[in-house]
UniProtKB/Swiss-Prot annotation:
Record's function text: Catalyzes the attachment of isoleucine to tRNA(Ile). As IleRS can inadvertently accommodate and process structurally similar amino acids such as valine, to avoid such errors it has two additional distinct tRNA(Ile)-dependent editing activities. One activity is designated as 'pretransfer' editing and involves the hydrolysis of activated Val-AMP. The other activity is designated 'posttransfer' editing and involves deacylation of mischarged Val-tRNA(Ile).
Catalytic activity of the protein: tRNA(Ile) + L-isoleucine + ATP = L-isoleucyl-tRNA(Ile) + AMP + diphosphate
GO biological process entries: isoleucyl-tRNA aminoacylation
EC number per UniProt: 6.1.1.5
Domain of life (superkingdom): Bacteria
Protein name per Swiss-Prot or TrEMBL: Isoleucine--tRNA ligase
GO molecular function, one term: isoleucine-tRNA ligase activity
Places the protein is found: Cytoplasm
GO terms for cellular component: cytoplasm
InterPro entries per the UniProt record, alphabetical: aa-tRNA-synth_I_CS, aa-tRNA-synth_Ia, Anticodon_Ile_ABEc, Ile-tRNA-ligase, Ile-tRNA-ligase_type2, M/V/L/I-tRNA-synth_anticd-bd, Rossmann-like_a/b/a_fold, tRNAsynth_Ia_anticodon-bd
Short motif 'HIGH' region, span: 58-68
Residues binding ATP: 630
Entry keyword annotation includes Transcription regulation: no
Length: 1054
């Protein structure tokens, strides 16, 4: 032990006297606010190249959650890093303000139940309320984002409801329209009757859209009544009953046709005597391959009368299920459709063209117009009087009852299936034919697939996997919403179909030119009030009126890159030269949401991707592995975590996990606290060690010749290079790994192995202090984006300068590289770790010296110059090096059957048996077993100890250590003395002595240990700074300190 001087560091104290990270973080946040450090980080790069980052706008009518927290950390790390790399990185926050989320929240707060109440209130009042409610939690958001040490510009943030933003949105609409990429159509769409609006296909693919639901299924009979002349229908089938299966009985009143597959074989089957009651003797028509699925209903002795290709059914007519539309033109015939399969049902599909996209396509080809007996509330209309006013799902019961009464239900079951629901209200959707405006995505689909190849995805497999496959199947995007609060569809049409005209507007100037007034709002109802006479109507009676729908809120979000800068009305040159963005990040579900629609609009408008690099992270789960739920309480409260462990701890836990590589992550308090131990504490402990022993300011130096200094500086070189490579690739988890491994080498090896030099002081060993200073100053810069507040405290304490976040990221070239030394020293660490594992397994304390350690490595001679380090670290008297690994262990080959099996087939078992029998040899870089060559990855090699009890493998190398654990009386005495020293050090500490205080010691020792105490007295006294050291057997009284069991001591300051 030696004297601790200290007092030089910190040069700037940001701890506020606290040793708790959360309290230090509050001090840092307060400093940043007063200092305006964030703005300074941008201003100092005004002449630098911009790094463009798109921050996906959240809704501010709800509080942030773990998903926002996770994404927010990435959104902070990348800009911080790129700033330190010399770029100017503006970070403007934005708010998503339009759409159903805002309307539903407003309805909830106003107690509104339906659209009728909104219209009674008035659109102006309702939308004004929406405008206020969407910003309800902006203060909480700002506090949350600020507390997580995320630097963003709130003051100049954009809102999608801003007039400038909305003008850019309508510009985009018109630009797409002029390119032939927007059209109006009548198509079957997912429709939310609860919210009175259609949705887009991608909205039904969001995480929460599909839910399990029980629904009735019916198999109904359709009596064949005739054939259409000129078709190839087989008249012999007249009088039979086609049977059709449906999971939506409520669509049967709208049935207008049946569909069969021309390539499928159908069977005419007679129901046997023990078949379904009421159908015995009837002849039923269904796909031959599905006859077995109806074995129970058809009866034991049911027989196939005849078989017919699907082409013989096409053109047959049948008796309608209901009479509502009996006279509908061209209806109630069997049509051909390739989409019909024999995977389930009967192979005959009922067609209700108003409620199924495939049905619509098939019936359109046969000139059968759809009928729509369902209103915007999802209820039946007067077209079906028996069910008028009933919600379609509620009507199932009555429809089934009526069909059974008619004898038309052959089978009635209940199915539990995954069914789409509204992602906002949670109510089940229906599919219904509606007029709508569409982006013609299919027209640019191939180009979208092509430009996706220019995007760098993390994880990489998403490019051609989840995102690429979605692009390949992309469909036209329905952008109409029959709602109130949103960007308007900027289309005006004539209100007289005799004088048709369509005008599309893309700017305030164009609107002002035609309507004579410049809009101050593009929201409803104000935009709806703009009307003018139809220029194409010579009578002057018709009027141009805006179509009532608003745009899908995702059109707003997808317009963010250009709309946030009011393109093309402002910042045109800037945007044209700064797109695509360098980087974006959101969770993986956005491959069908924001990522996708950014890509659609960018390719459609600019023929390029919207972003160059993207991270699609996984999902944060509760501590039970399930979705986070406030009612279940299955996740740590964020505020409590911030108060207890700090934001940096949470940041490290999330960023170092597999979630940034697309995996999911279970959040636990234990995991967060473990994050503190991985990087924050090691860094802080190394800094505190320097604080404790430095008597003067250290200086930057990489010139030390000491082997430990050379090692840690070479490790520092590798750290900077590896973290730079990882963050350049946006592999944040890998960057965290590198920092964690370095911190382990720094504190658990370098500082510990260098303690004697530090205890001797900076006059005796300035190179040690300068090296540690250099390492810490560099390490804090490397880790600054990952632990922004912890590193700020340490870096300012070390340097006294303004902020670590105003510095440049280190260059690996600033440090000496020494790959051989790093490899050798890391092997030594591995040797010591392996030896320690043997001690631990045998419960041999580290202070007990052992006689010998044998190190077996193929090139063990490289360790010869470092035996003293190994001896001291492992606490052995001798270290033997040998290159004869076979003397202490053997290499075994293990076949990876899962990998080798597909290639080797049945020979894989032969190879496994040969390997187990030792019938194999290594040939070059491969293994040959029983004459069969195994390829890389099809096998692994492992080193097995000859005596596992005293042997352990060295990590990451083909080597073993063998520990001699025979304890002699001399070694036991020496270990006892070391234990006494440790006990006396504890006594010094509990007595409140300073590290440098000299003391007097009286040690009371049992008679059998007197000789040990006397033999090692000088050593013990020297270690505990005792100027007087007396050994006795006397009782030292109640105030004595227990040093060991049966050993007490009195200590006094000199």
């Amino acid at each position: 032990m030696t004297e601790a001087v200290g007092g030089v560091y910190p040069l700037v104290d940001m701890t506020g006297g606290s040793s708790r990270f959360p309290e230090m973080e509050e001090n840092v946040l307060d400093f940043w606010k007063r200092d305006d450090t964030f703005q300074a980080s941008i201003d100092q790069r005004n002449d630098a190249e911009d790094y463009v980052f798109y921050d996906g706008p959240p809704f501010a009518n709800g509080l942030p959650h773990y998903g926002h927290l996770l994404t927010g950390y990435v959104k902070d790390i990348v800009p911080r890093y790129q700033t330190m790399r010399g770029y100017r990185v503006p970070r403007v926050f934005g708010w998503d303000t339009h759409g159903l989320p805002a309307e539903l929240e407003a309805e909830k707060q106003l107690g509104i139940k339906d659209k009728g109440e909104i219209e009674s209130m008035g659109l102006a009042q309702f939308n004004d309320y929406c405008a206020k409610s969407v910003l309800q939690y902006t203060k909480e958001w700002e506090e949350y984002v600020t507390r997580q040490a995320r630097w963003v510009d709130f003051e100049n943030g954009y809102k999608t409801m801003d007039l400038t933003y909305m003008e850019s949105v309508i510009w985009a609409f018109k630009e797409l329209y002029d390119k032939g990429l927007i059209y109006q159509g009548f198509r079957v769409l997912p429709y939310s009757w609860a919210e009175h609006t259609p949705l887009s296909n991608q909205e039904t693919r969001l995480d929460d859209s599909y839910k399990m639901r029980q629904d009735p299924t019916l198999t109904v009979t359709m009596p064949i009544t005739g054939k259409i002349e000129g078709t190839g229908a087989n008249e012999a089938l007249i009088g039979a009953n086609a049977i059709a299966w449906t999971t939506t009985p409520w669509t049967l009143p709208s049935n207008l046709a049946l569909a069969v597959n021309p390539s499928v074989t159908y069977a005419l089957v007679e129901v046997a005597g023990d078949g379904e009651e009421g159908f015995v003797g009837q002849q039923l028509l269904l796909a031959r391959d599905l006859v077995g699925a109806y074995a129970k209903e058809l009866g034991t002795d049911a027989r196939i009368i005849s078989e017919h290709p699907g082409t013989e059914l096409i053109g047959l007519t049948y008796e309608p299920v209901f009479d509502f539309f009996r006279d509908h033109p061209n209806a109630f015939q069997i049509l051909g459709a390739d989409y019909v399969t024999t995977e389930d049902g009967t192979g005959i599909v009922h067609q209700a063209p108003a409620f199924g996209e495939d049905d619509m396509n098939v019936c359109n080809a046969a000139d059968i117009a759809p009928v729509i007996p369902v209103d915007m509330d999802g209820k039946f209309t007067s077209l079906t009087p028996e069910y008028e006013g009933q919600l379609v799902f509620d009507a199932n019961k009555d429809i089934i009852r009526d069909l059974k009464a008619k004898g038309r239900v052959f089978r009635h079951q209940t199915i539990e299936h995954s069914y789409p629901h509204s992602w906002r209200s949670g109510e089940p959707l229906i599919y219904m034919a509606l007029p709508s405006w569409f982006v013609n995505v299919t027209k640019i689909r191939d180009r979208m697939v092509e430009t996706n190849q220019d995007i760098e995805w993390m994880p990489a497999h998403i490019r051609d996997g989840q995102f690429g496959k979605w692009l390949e199947g992309a469909r036209d995007w329905n952008i109409s919403r029959s709602r109130y609060w949103g960007s308007p569809i900027p289309v005006w049409v004539s209100d007289d179909e005799n004088y048709p005209r369509v005008d599309v507007y893309g700017s305030l100037d164009e609107l002002e030119a035609d309507f004579g007034v410049r809009p101050t709002s593009l929201h409803r109802p104000y935009i709806d009030e703009l009307t003018r006479p139809n220029p194409d109507d010579p009578t002057g009676k018709s009027t141009m009126r805006r179509v009532p729908d608003v745009l899908d809120v995702w059109f707003d979000s997808g317009s963010m890159p250009f709309a946030q800068v009011h393109y093309p009305f402002e910042n045109k040159d800037w945007f044209d030269t700064h797109a695509p963005a360098d980087f974006i990040v959101e969770y993986i579900g956005q491959t069908r949401g924001w990522f996708y629609l950014l890509h659609v609009l960018s390719v459609g408008l600019f023929d390029r991707p919207a972003f160059k690099k993207v991270v699609a992270h996984g999902i944060v789960l509760g501590d039970d592995g399930l979705k986070m739920s406030k009612s279940k309480g299955n996740y740590p409260n964020v505020t409590e975590v911030f108060d207890r462990d700090g934001s940096d701890a949470m940041r490290w836990f999330l960023m170092s996990s597999p979630i940034l590589r697309g995996g999911n992550l279970i959040v636990t308090e234990k995991g967060i606290r473990e994050g503190v131990r991985q990087a924050q504490l090691p860094m802080w402990n190394a800094y505190s060690f320097l604080q404790l022993y430095a008597s003067k300011k250290a200086t930057w130096s990489v010139d030390s010749t000491d082997v430990l200094d050379r090692y840690i500086l070479a490790k520092l070189h590798d750290l900077v290079a590896d973290v730079t490579a990882a963050l350049d690739a946006t592999d944040i988890a890998r960057a965290c790994d590198q920092v964690r491994w370095f911190c382990d080498a720094l504190t658990n090896w370098y500082v510990r192995r260098s303690r004697d030099r530090f205890w001797a002081g900076d006059e005796a060993h300035p190179e040690a202090f300068n090296t540690l200073y250099t390492v810490l100053e560099t390490l804090t810069r490397v880790a600054a984006p990952l632990l922004p507040m912890t590193t700020e405290v340490i870096w300012r304490g070390l340097t006294g300068e303004r902020s670590v976040h105003l510095t440049d990221f280190p260059s690996a070239d600033s440090f000496p590289a020494d790959a051989d030394l790093v490899r050798t020293m890391d092997e030594i660490r591995g040797v010591c770790s392996a030896a320690s594992s043997i001690r631990k397994a045998h419960k041999l304390r580290n202070r007990l010296p052992l006689p010998n350690l044998t190190v077996a490595l193929p090139d063990s001679g490289r360790l010869a110059d470092f035996l003293s380090i190994i001896r001291d670290e492992v606490n052995v008297k001798n270290v033997d090096l040998t290159s004869d690994v076979d003397a202490v262990g053997t290499f075994e080959v293990v076949v990876n059957a899962k990998v080798a099996g597909p290639r080797l087939g049945k020979d894989v078992q032969r190879v496994i048996k040969a390997v187990k029998a030792g019938n194999y040899e290594r040939v070059g870089e491969t293994v040959v077993a029983d004459g069969i060559e195994l390829q890389d990855g099809e096998y692994t090699e492992r080193l097995v100890a000859a005596n596992p009890d005293s042997t352990a493998q060295i990590d990451d190398v083909d080597g073993l250590v063998v520990l001699d654990m025979e304890v002699t009386p001399e070694l036991e005495a020496e270990g006892w003395a070391a234990d006494v020293i440790r006990g006396l050090q504890d006594a010094r500490k509990s007595s409140g002595f300073e590290v440098s205080d000299r003391i007097q010691v009286t040690l009371s020792v049992p008679g059998d240990k007197q000789e040990w105490a006397t033999r090692h007295a000088d050593h013990i006294a020297g270690e505990v700074l005792a100027t007087s050291f007396e050994v006795t057997q006397d009782d030292l009284g109640e105030d004595a300190h227990e040093v060991l069991k049966g050993v007490t001591a009195s200590v006094a300051r000199v």
